């Protein structure tokens, strides 16, 4: 295919990587760029739901993800005063999905799995330390302006997928709004090996625990 039939993807997070693999498996050439020198590891989310797992199965990466994560067939909302408020058994979805459970796994592990697959493919170009700065479009396709270690560069493609995060340069330069709000409270996200099951009766593998004073989950 000519270069202008290539799909450009900005951002090598879970969305960008998954889109790249989906397109490449269907014979569509892809250029995936990432502003960082390596794949980001500060991705906050860690839950993969049944529809996402079905999609990842179609992409051929579900087995690797299962090896990296924890299978959770149920999850809870809890209150420190009342105990279990609600319990969800994902097994009820067994006739609607091939994966009636959630997988708890850091998102960066998925991006590593997918990029390893992309690097085996001839129609994919994965480039790091490439930062999007702007974009334009004409009847022939799209131009993505980027900064590289060697200086400014233009990438040409038929389409552009913006997966460059909450502060997306591409979205901003296109004037696309991202309405929302910011909570005034400060939040701390941490990983721990603390044995919560020793302190909460009937604790599910995933539990969101609310407290009226400390607000923890």
Give residue spans per PLM region.
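Core beta-strand elements of the Rossmann-like FAD/NAD(P) dinucleotide-binding domain
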Residues: 3-5, 150-159
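A conserved short coil-to-beta-strand element within the FAD-binding core of flavoproteins
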Residues: 128-142
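Beta1/beta-strand and adjacent pyrophosphate-binding region of the FAD-binding site
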Residues: 2-15
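Glycine-rich FAD pyrophosphate-binding loop
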Residues: 24-44
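Conserved FAD-binding catalytic core of PHBH/FMO-like flavoproteins
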Residues: 116, 152, 159, 163-217
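Active-site-adjacent segment of FAD-dependent monooxygenases/related oxidoreductases
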Residues: 44, 49-117, 136
């Amino acid at each position: 295919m000519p270069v202008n039939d290539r799909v450009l993807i900005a951002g090598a997070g879970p969305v960008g990587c998954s889109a790249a693999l989906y397109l490449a498996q269907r014979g569509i050439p892809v250029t995936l760029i990432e502003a960082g020198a390596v794949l980001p590891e500060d991705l906050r989310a860690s839950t993969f739901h049944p529809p996402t797992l079905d999609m990842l199965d179609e992409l051929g990466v579900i087995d690797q993800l299962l090896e990296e994560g924890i299978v959770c067939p149920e999850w809870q909302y809890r209150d420190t005063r009342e105990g279990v408020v609600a319990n969800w058994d994902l097994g009820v979805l067994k006739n609607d999905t091939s994966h009636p459970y959630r997988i708890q796994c850091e998102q960066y592990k998925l991006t590593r799995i997918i990029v390893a697959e992309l690097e085996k493919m001839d129609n994919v170009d994965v480039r790091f330390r490439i930062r999007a700065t702007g974009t334009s479009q004409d009847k022939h396709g799209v131009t993505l302006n980027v900064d590289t270690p060697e200086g400014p560069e233009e990438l040409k493609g038929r389409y552009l997928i913006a997966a460059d995060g909450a502060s997306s340069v591409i979205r901003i330069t296109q004037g696309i709004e991202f309405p929302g709000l910011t909570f005034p409270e400060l939040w701390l996200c941490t990983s721990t090996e603390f044995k919560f099951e020793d302190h909460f009766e009937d604790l599910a593998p995933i539990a969101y625990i609310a407290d009226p004073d400390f607000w923890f989950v």
